Regions:
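Catalytic Cys-His active-site segments of thiol-dependent hydrolases/isopeptidases
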Residues: 125-141, 405-406, 410-444
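Sec-dependent N-terminal signal peptides
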Residues: 1-8
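C-terminal motif of bacterial Sec signal peptides marking the signal peptidase cleavage site
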Residues: 12-15
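Surface-exposed intrinsically disordered loops and tails
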Residues: 86-88, 199-202, 206-209, 225-240, ...
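A recurrent domain-boundary module in secreted/ectodomain proteins
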Residues: 434-502
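Active-site-adjacent substructure of cysteine-protease-like catalytic cores
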Residues: 94-118, 348-426
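Acidic/polar, low-complexity intrinsically disordered N-terminal segments immediately downstream
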Residues: 1, 18-115, 130, 135-234, ...
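Cysteine-nucleophile protease catalytic domains, especially the papain-like/related folds used
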Residues: 19-68, 247, 251-354
Length: 502
């Protein structure tokens, strides 16, 4: 697999949430409306220079306090790979923008910043129907890119492009004119010799419009640790169960959210007693978490021993209270306990709900980071009625959990005789819980299970049908997490006895 084939898996495709020509529109109809307005521009192909300018605008504007101030002149870009995705040609019965999407070129850029000596990579495109900037990992190495999170994006990339192709081919002249009318864009088209309508606008550049990077996590925790340090994220779990079980993605995500808020917290007595019996490192510690020493460095490897011990102890406690099912290749947790766990620690939250960009944006603006999860397995449940099998429900399991802690928006202004068409793409910043690897900005639309952001059952058989590494089903979030000091009594305890025969 080429570097691009691997990393293209990490891209998210666009959401057009700023377009509002229909009230209460679904995400899919909003995307379709934006494609109709884009058809009215008469042009959809950007030059590579314009595409790189969009990427540069994103990189310089989305800087956070955790990074040094970034200058546009500090970046150097290298085209690492490119690929073209082809689709069957479709004859469209419309005079406005009659071309179907036959092929799309995607580009993988590596970049470095000489001022802060950081390096990262990005997925881009020169086709505005897909988007100029698709994913940005500000600090990351392609060689470190092989993890489960990328496998999910590979499938989403294929299917999201297919969804875009279908939507583009579906719109007709009448729909384009209607959308333009609602957007208060007049359609005074010219007729060429081939009777093709041309509604030409001056295409603008994609630039960073707004975002909120004030809630970014200051931790880059993981499920074990690749460093040489004696105490790793899963050391306390290993001390209790005598096997190198991973902490689990939900455990790591929730631990990082707690480290962001730094609530007053004492280890749950049952967990502290169990840990004291098995691990001498906690001897003399009263179970009170000292967030200052736990977060002095983003990585556990560079903390003091006391800080390392408390981070490892926190991972053990959360895993236990989530009812973790431990494993050396992966540790799962009961997602039904997410909300109650936060409540028991004095945090109000809205529990698991369906993903939407507006929920993410509002939650970050009002409170801070939120939890996201995607399921990897779908199980249909049936009953027999008069000998005939009938589906009665569907359940989801497996997958991955991560933190969303920022959002950002890119916009493009297209003009014609004073009229303006504005296109918009929304991004969310994900801390995926692998020690900073692949933390970055991804297009929000891929998470929306109501529109394109899913792996179709008809296609997942290629690679991902009910495979644990893929979490294409039922992406949900726990929004509005915030400390209110109201501790709801929940009877947790050591929740799962590890299976020694796994």
């Amino acid at each position: 697999m080429s570097a691009f084939a691997l990393v293209v898996a990490s891209c998210f495709f666009f959401s057009c949430a700023d377009l509002n020509v229909e009230s209460n529109s679904s995400a899919e109809s909003i995307r379709k409306q934006e494609l109709a307005l884009l058809a009215a521009t008469g042009g959809y192909v950007l030059s590579e220079d314009v595409m790189k300018d969009s990427l540069l605008s994103f990189l310089t504007a989305s800087d956070t306090e955790s990074r040094s101030v970034i200058s546009a002149n500090s970046y150097e870009f290298t085209l690492a790979d490119e690929t073209t995705v082809s689709y069957p040609e479709v004859r469209l019965e419309r005079s406005i923008a009659p071309e179907s999407i036959n092929s799309l070129s995607l580009y993988l850029y590596e970049f470095s910043n000489k001022d802060n000596e950081s390096s990262g990579f990005a997925i881009t495109s020169t086709d505005e129907r897909i988007g100029s900037v698709l994913a940005v990992v500000p600090e990351g190495n392609l060689e470190d890119g092989e993890n489960d999170f990328l496998a999910f994006y590979t499938e989403c990339l294929e299917n999201y492009i297919e969804e875009t192709v279908d939507l583009w081919n579906e719109i007709d002249d009448e729909y384009i004119r209607a959308v333009c009318k609602e957007a208060r864009v007049t359609v005074n088209s010219e007729r060429s010799g081939t009777a093709q309508e041309t509604i030409l606008y001056e295409n603008g550049e994609w630039t960073y419009k707004y975002g909120n990077n004030s809630r970014v996590l200051r931790t880059a925790w993981g499920q074990s640790d690749t460093y040489v340090s004696e105490i790793k994220y899963n050391t306390a779990i290993k001390a209790v169960y005598k096997k190198a079980y991973l902490t689990g993605c939900a455990t790591t995500a929730i631990a990082q959210i707690l480290a962001y808020y730094k609530p007053p917290m004492i280890m749950y007595p049952v967990c502290l007693e169990a840990l004291n019996r098995k691990w001498d490192k906690t001897s003399g510690w009263d179970g009170t978490y000292n967030w200052q020493i736990m977060t002095e460095n983003p990585s556990i490897a560079y903390l003091s021993e006391s800080g390392q011990v408390q981070v490892a102890a926190l991972m053990y406690e959360i895993a236990e209270r989530l009812g973790a099912k431990y494993g050396t290749n992966g540790t799962s947790a009961k997602h039904s306990r997410y909300g109650s766990l936060f409540s028991s620690l004095g945090f109000a939250n809205d529990g698991l709900s369906s993903y939407s960009y507006n929920k993410v944006k509002n939650s970050i603006d009002k409170y801070g980071p939120l939890l996201a999860r995607g399921a990897s397995k779908k199980t249909n449940h049936y009953i027999k009625i008069f000998g005939k099998k009938t589906k009665v429900s569907t359940s989801y399991s497996g997958g991955h959990a991560w933190v969303i802690d920022e959002y950002a928006n890119l916009s493009c202004i297209n003009k014609k005789s004073g009229e303006v068409i504005e296109a918009s793409k929304d991004f969310v910043h994900c801390n995926v819980g692998w020690q900073g690897n692949c933390d970055g900005y991804y297009l929000s639309g891929v998470f929306d299970m109501n529109s394109g952001g899913y792996v179709k059952d008809s296609s997942i058989g290629r690679d991902a049908a009910n495979v644990e590494d893929f979490y294409q089903y039922e992406v949900r979030i726990v929004p509005d997490i915030h400390f209110n000091g109201v501790y709801e009594p929940v009877n947790f305890g050591v929740a799962y006895e590890a299976d020694e025969d796994e």
